[in-house]
Design a protein with these regions (language model features):
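SF2 helicase catalytic motif II
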Residues: 1-19, 29-32
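Conserved helicase motor core of P-loop NTPases
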Residues: 17, 21-30, 36-187, 193-195, ...
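Long insertion/accessory domains within large nucleic-acid-processing enzymes
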Residues: 229-282
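Short, charge-rich amphipathic segments
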Residues: 15, 56, 254-257
Length: 282
């Protein structure tokens, strides 16, 4: 419920704002859907929006329904078997001892040694394609290591950013789609592909690139500005202290603007402040 960014919408308490907005209307109802086994918001141990007791604290009448029947996986799936074992451990609060994964007896779940990993990923790319292959890691730091390893040892890309690179949007952005009727905004988690790197440069103590990209889910091309610094950070996006630095450094360009409102209007129209934050998406 607490906003962690320096500059947030509303009060910075998302659940409070959502409930206040919905129930300010007449005869409104709110349905919250989610998975209690997924990660909660950053720096929290549970998801407030999925906790009936927290919701009742807003003086709401709460009904809770849990779906348990799996319908889109094979009953013999090793992925489903082990995921269910983890889910049961979470529900029974026995996660202090991590459940041992069952490896044998499945065709879709197996152990790969470290010295086989590069070859396995390369084979998956050749067999199924990069877009159909996803590597999941336990931390942002390891994700950065995997991304760099894949680019260097499988795709043989030595440049900081190359045509063909797959990127994931790391923060919602409303600036670059303002004049586009097909997209309202660029969402966190959106996958894009670099078509052309027109130029890279340094400004305000940060590194930027002007690129042409294709949006995988929209078959749409767009010219955008991206922040190269986020590609190698061990955080999901630009850390707060660097966000603050970028904001206040750019703000100095508008010292001649007399009012705070005028300064903020300039900032909202500044392409460097509204730069796309991205991570490699391998």
């Amino acid at each position: 419920n607490e906003g962690l960014d320096s500059f947030v919408f509303g009060t910075g308490r998302l659940l409070d704002d959502l409930i206040q907005y919905v129930y300010s209307g007449e005869n409104c109802r709110l349905i919250l859907m989610g998975d209690v086994a997924q990660l909660p918001p950053v720096m929290q141990t549970e998801s407030p929006a999925l906790n009936p007791e927290i919701l009742r604290g807003y003086n709401l009448q709460v009904q809770e329904i849990t779906l348990t029947q799996v319908v889109r996986q094979s009953e013999n799936s090793g992925i489903l078997f082990n995921a269910t074992r983890l889910r049961d451990a979470l529900r029974n609060e026995t996660v202090e001892i991590f459940p041992k994964l069952k490896l044998k007896g499945f065709t879709d779940f197996r152990k790969v040694n470290g010295d086989e990993l590069i070859e396995e990923i390369s084979s998956a790319y050749s067999r199924d394609g990069i877009e159909e292959t996803m590597i999941i890691s336990r931390s942002n730091k390891r994700a950065t290591l995997y991304n760099n390893g894949i680019r260097n040892r499988i795709l043989y890309r030595e440049e900081e950013l190359s045509s063909g690179d797959r990127l994931m949007i790391a923060k919602n952005n409303y600036f670059w789609t303002a004049d586009n009727k097909e997209m309202d905004f660029i969402a966190n988690g959106e996958i894009i592909q670099v078509l052309r790197v027109r130029r890279t440069y340094e400004l305000y103590g940060f590194r930027f690139a002007d690129v042409s990209v294709r949006f995988q889910d929209y078959d749409l091309e767009m010219d955008v500005k991206i922040l190269l610094d986020t590609l190698q950070t061990d955080a999901p996006a630009l850390p707060k202290e660097l966000n603050d630095k970028l904001f206040y450094t750019i703000l100095e360009d508008y010292d001649d603007v007399p009012t705070k409102a005028g300064k903020m209007k300039k900032m909202k129209a500044d392409p460097h402040y509204n730069v796309l934050q991205v991570k490699f998406a391998y």
